[in-house]
């Protein structure tokens, strides 16, 4: 139509109307098609306009679709491209006229909607019947469009931009959807002070991730709603700007800038009534910049920030502030820094107490106060890579979630009984097919047993359902209580004191009494645990870090008390070393060790082959059931001074900077481990300087500036300095090789004694048991006679070399012979292998049976 200048959305609506008419078999396009097409656009302006009139757009769209379905149908060649009928052309003319009246350069969809309502057709009648007359629709334009004119083909980005690209935090606070903020009064007061300035009233919250920067802004929103702010902030609206949704879908150059400008214009036109919050403030630097253009979000808001027309609260981490904001001095000077530090453990407990009720209602479980204290203390001690209160809140959340999952899934007793019943049912089916007397007798007994088990199962399931029902009833009552408290706060703000009195002195106390009674009843339940305890928190800590933080079970206590005997099964004749290591582990597990130092740090001295490395492996096996579960650093690889970089990671600017160090990365991934520095005397002396902090403070900073926690590791250094000398000579050798400050930081220097002939006999037993374990894979049984063991102990005894010659001897005397016999077929898989001494030929004889 000549002179008709539609926006992109209007063009799409016209095209959709054409398609609807064609698909329905209608000979022409009518206003009904136009109305159905306009209201089918989810992101158009017509829907918010119709909603502003108090009419439900979905209902009108369905009724318009019904009108289209009733229109006369035709058959013919022109159905693929129907024309507008007289009523539809009249709508388009009216729309063009109205656009001119409004000063619009393009006809937008809300103007087209008003034009449909102005006509004398069925679509207009439908709108009028619902109360959306031409005058009513036109009357709500200012509330939706503001004072903006349609000057582009896509005005939708400019209308209601704030509603689209932001979240109203004050509205969420009114609805009770924001968690309470405990403490942080000083930081909130500082933010309020900066916001109350005349110019540059833009605070930026800077702190580590998880310390509660966003929570401070949410706390401010709650205070604004409660009126607990200075006059300059009373009644203000606090919005959170979503830059992500603003950038998303901006296909053409300038589209993002258009959206941002529309948002900024709305904020400006509010004349200081809106405070804007941008989480991850550093994202404004570079957001929306294209090619060589310097026009990004940061540069667009600078003038507004300087003049005080935009009150902006930002939040970002220290690293990102330094990396993005500080580089732009003009942007940085417009912000006032508010540093948010990590709260202390005591403050974190207070924060958790404030959030406790929300988490209890969400998960439907009770949380003990001691569990909150445990969450703060254990997270502070063991989860060192994150910050309070975030990590403590996560612990409580996951512990409650774990408990809820256990409540919802069937208990172990029911599980076991169900398996027994299933097994008996299968057996019953099998026996019912048998005809012999024994089977029939067994079937009678089995059916009786099955009936008993089913009865037991039925009772347990009924009891479980009752307990679960009681717990769920408490949960529902708590949810209702939370809703009533929120209603009471809203009524108090609205001045409805009658409702406040009814809720606070009637329904809320009554419900609180019901909850208390129901909780007393659920305490008596035995099948289901519905209380988060310190042990539950400790289990979650153990799952996250691998550190056994919970109470020791009886079995573990006995295991720790008998630790020397357990380690002695692998390490023979070194009782002093075994006792020293066992004492260190027991101290740590019992909680009497210094929490700021490693569990234990030892220097093992002694000749080669006496069990220094073997003790480290035995300790790893004792603690983790796997002797390879340790960090082993072979110090002979660190003979050069520059090799220290491999332990902690290369410094910035060097190749491999982003890969981390061999020591620091391994301990960061597994903070509860055994670290073995083997053959330390082979390393360059400067390598030990980096271990000083580890031994004293239990921490080490890697090449990327991250602090790695060594407080839950056992550090073992092995060396054969002064081997063969007396104890004093060995200690003198240590003092010559290592600096005093290094030796002084070790828990103990343990000297390993050379092995005696008798001790070697025990080692023969251990080595043969290991060989038998390897042969078990081929179903071979190994039987070694006492004379053969004695022969091995005598021939393998070389005091200067320890137990290693014995291992070589077993390999040659038994392993080599056995390998040949297996390959030749003399010994087959599944055989029993006998090893005897052949004293005449000074060797061993292998036979199979």
UniProtKB/Swiss-Prot annotation:
Gene Ontology CC entries for this record: cytoplasm
CDD domains linked to this entry: AAA (cd00009), RecA-like_ClpB_Hsp104-like (cd19499)
Pfam families: AAA, AAA_2, AAA_lid_9, Clp_N, ClpB_D2-small
Chain intervals for the UniProt region annotation (C-terminal): 755-849
Record's subcellular location: Cytoplasm
Positions that bind ATP 1: 207-214
Region (NBD2) location: 556-754
Chain residue ranges for the region called NBD1: 160-342
NCBIfam families linked: chaperone_ClpB (TIGR03346)
Function per UniProt: Part of a stress-induced multi-chaperone system, it is involved in the recovery of the cell from heat-induced damage, in cooperation with DnaK, DnaJ and GrpE. Acts before DnaK, in the processing of protein aggregates. Protein binding stimulates the ATPase activity; ATP hydrolysis unfolds the denatured protein aggregates, which probably helps expose new hydrophobic binding sites on the surface of ClpB-bound aggregates, contributing to the solubilization and refolding of denatured protein aggregates by DnaK.
Protein name as annotated: Chaperone protein ClpB
Organism, scientific name: Corynebacterium diphtheriae (strain ATCC 700971 / NCTC 13129 / Biotype gravis)
